[in-house]
Amino acid sequence: MVQVKAIKAFSDNYIWCLTTSNNTQAWVVDPGQAEPVLDYLAQHNLTLAGILITHHHYDHTDGVAKLVSENPNIAVYGPTNSPFKGITQQLTDGQSITVLNTAFNIIATPGHTLDHICYVNEQLAFTGDTLFSGGCGRLFEGSAEQMWHSFNKLRELPADCKVYCTHEYTQANLAFATAIEPRNPELLAYSKRVDELRSKNEITLPSTIGQELKINPFMRSDLPNITELLPKEFCSVTKNNEPWENFAGLRKFKDHF
């Protein structure tokens, strides 16, 4: 069974390290820095076997070159249409790969960037900068309609599927979420737990798909009243709004929150 551990990088990034109990191989997801990965591998007597990339941003890819130079035979998996040129195994929507004897499906999730993909199965979802706990990535390249379509793919995963995103943004995301749904009891309870974890400098991840469907306003954009507290300059609230229009309004407000 795959075990997932967080390697901290930069100020708020997590590089996810995948291992199993019966061998010394490791895979990492979105290594924005090489040094924390190399240190972790050395401390735990692990050998790097491969790299998974969700999208091209530097804080997800800058460590790749050094890691490959130290481990020249490893594969670097990533999206086929990516501006990042360090990918050796290109992936498209609907493909599957095997990592440590575990199958992952590739889901194209454009929105944050156009090349973004997620690596998912029924137990684990590596969502990069698409889905955060309590939030979502900024729309740097794609549209709100694209991002909502991407979210709909993730919403179909099992409720107990664990969500491993790449940033410790949970506390800030929940401050926004509670401004949107101040009477959501699940959200208020989750926010309290997250505050307690962060007060001890502990990680708030992984979340689960089921948890996000209860507390993440972006995952709940299909609810007709989700935008009722938005300032009108960000979203015209009508009963006929498409979910992606609600999503767009939420994202615009979050950008100014």
From Swiss-Prot:
GO terms for molecular function: hydroxyacylglutathione hydrolase activity; metal ion binding. One of its GO terms (biological process) is methylglyoxal catabolic process to D-lactate via S-lactoyl-glutathione. Zn(2+) 2 binds at residues 59-60, 129, 167. The keyword Phosphoprotein does not apply. Its cofactor is Zn(2+). Keywords: Hydrolase, Metal-binding, Zinc. Pfam families: HAGH_C, Lactamase_B. NCBIfam families: GSH_gloB. Belongs to the metallo-beta-lactamase superfamily. Glyoxalase II family. This is Hydroxyacylglutathione hydrolase. It comes from Pseudoalteromonas translucida (strain TAC 125).
